[in-house]
């Protein structure tokens, strides 16, 4: 039991590692929270620091979610324990102890978490994100559409009630973290991301 609890605590601390903040400081010598959208996330790093820095941040955030959940099964192979570990990773990223509990929006880490928990709903969500982004160039819109699909696909693909409830809770958290983006989308003032546009 002690090992299980320690693993969850370690997962929270790993999830709390502020990838965007660290990468931005290392590359642009700036506090990512003070530039662009002010969000400590991969998209803001991509836009304000550079493509390479953004990709590094994205990969780091995904791994923060995937690795702890994947290896949780070696400690306890019950799905409920994996969900607890996944929740710790998400909470760590969104409410990081290293930045006064003000972290990212949870999309990339959520992607890692869900790929470790359930592959098909994650692949469908990734495809939905891609389509929404390609047609709109809004990362926030793609993220919102993708995360909304998760509880729906997990339900229709026959996953347990426990899974559906967990994905629904994470969906609500991510949508809440995107509340300012939603406001800007409605006002048509949200920034688009053009990957191949030169700075």
UniProtKB/Swiss-Prot annotation:
<protein>
    <recommendedName>
        <fullName>Glycerol-3-phosphate acyltransferase</fullName>
        <ecNumber>2.3.1.275</ecNumber>
    </recommendedName>
</protein>
<keyword id="KW-0812">Transmembrane</keyword>
<keyword id="KW-0443">Lipid metabolism</keyword>
<keyword id="KW-0472">Membrane</keyword>
<feature type="transmembrane region" description="Helical">
    <location>
        <begin position="113"/>
        <end position="133"/>
    </location>
</feature>
<keyword id="KW-0808">Transferase</keyword>
<keyword id="KW-1003">Cell membrane</keyword>
<comment type="function">
    <text>Catalyzes the transfer of an acyl group from acyl-phosphate (acyl-PO(4)) to glycerol-3-phosphate (G3P) to form lysophosphatidic acid (LPA). This enzyme utilizes acyl-phosphate as fatty acyl donor, but not acyl-CoA or acyl-ACP.</text>
</comment>
<keyword id="KW-0444">Lipid biosynthesis</keyword>
<dbReference type="InterPro" id="IPR003811">
    <property type="entry name" value="G3P_acylTferase_PlsY"/>
</dbReference>
<dbReference type="Pfam" id="PF02660">
    <property type="entry name" value="G3P_acyltransf"/>
</dbReference>
<keyword id="KW-0997">Cell inner membrane</keyword>
<feature type="transmembrane region" description="Helical">
    <location>
        <begin position="79"/>
        <end position="99"/>
    </location>
</feature>
<dbReference type="GO" id="GO:0005886">
    <property type="term" value="C:plasma membrane"/>
</dbReference>
<dbReference type="GO" id="GO:0043772">
    <property type="term" value="F:acyl-phosphate glycerol-3-phosphate acyltransferase activity"/>
</dbReference>
<comment type="subunit">
    <text>Probably interacts with PlsX.</text>
</comment>
<keyword id="KW-0594">Phospholipid biosynthesis</keyword>
<feature type="transmembrane region" description="Helical">
    <location>
        <begin position="155"/>
        <end position="175"/>
    </location>
</feature>
<comment type="pathway">
    <text>Lipid metabolism; phospholipid metabolism.</text>
</comment>
<feature type="transmembrane region" description="Helical">
    <location>
        <begin position="3"/>
        <end position="23"/>
    </location>
</feature>
<keyword id="KW-1133">Transmembrane helix</keyword>
<dbReference type="GO" id="GO:0008654">
    <property type="term" value="P:phospholipid biosynthetic process"/>
</dbReference>
<keyword id="KW-1208">Phospholipid metabolism</keyword>
<feature type="transmembrane region" description="Helical">
    <location>
        <begin position="55"/>
        <end position="75"/>
    </location>
</feature>
<comment type="similarity">
    <text>Belongs to the PlsY family.</text>
</comment>
């Amino acid at each position: 039991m002690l090992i299980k609890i320690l693993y969850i605590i370690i997962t929270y601390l790993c999830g709390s590692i502020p990838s965007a903040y660290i990468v931005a400081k290392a590359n642009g010598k700036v506090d990512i929270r003070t530039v662009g959208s002010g969000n400590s996330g991969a998209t803001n790093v991509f836009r304000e620091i550079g493509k390479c820095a953004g990709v590094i941040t994205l990969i780091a955030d995904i791994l923060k979610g995937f690795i702890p959940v994947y290896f949780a099964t070696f400690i306890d192979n019950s799905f409920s324990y994996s969900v607890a570990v996944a929740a710790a990773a998400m909470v760590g990223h969104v409410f990081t102890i290293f930045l006064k509990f003000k972290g990212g929006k949870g999309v990339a880490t959520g992607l890692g978490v869900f790929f470790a928990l359930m592959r098909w709903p994650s692949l469908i969500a990734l495809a939905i994100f891609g389509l929404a982004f390609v047609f709109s160039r809004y990362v926030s819109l793609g993220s919102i559409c993708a995360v909304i699909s998760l509880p729906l696909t997990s339900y229709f693909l026959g996953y347990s009630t426990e899974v559906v409830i967990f994905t629904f809770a994470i969906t609500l958290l991510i949508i809440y973290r995107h509340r300012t983006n939603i406001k800007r989308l409605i006002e048509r003032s949200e920034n688009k991301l053009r990957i191949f546009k030169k700075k």
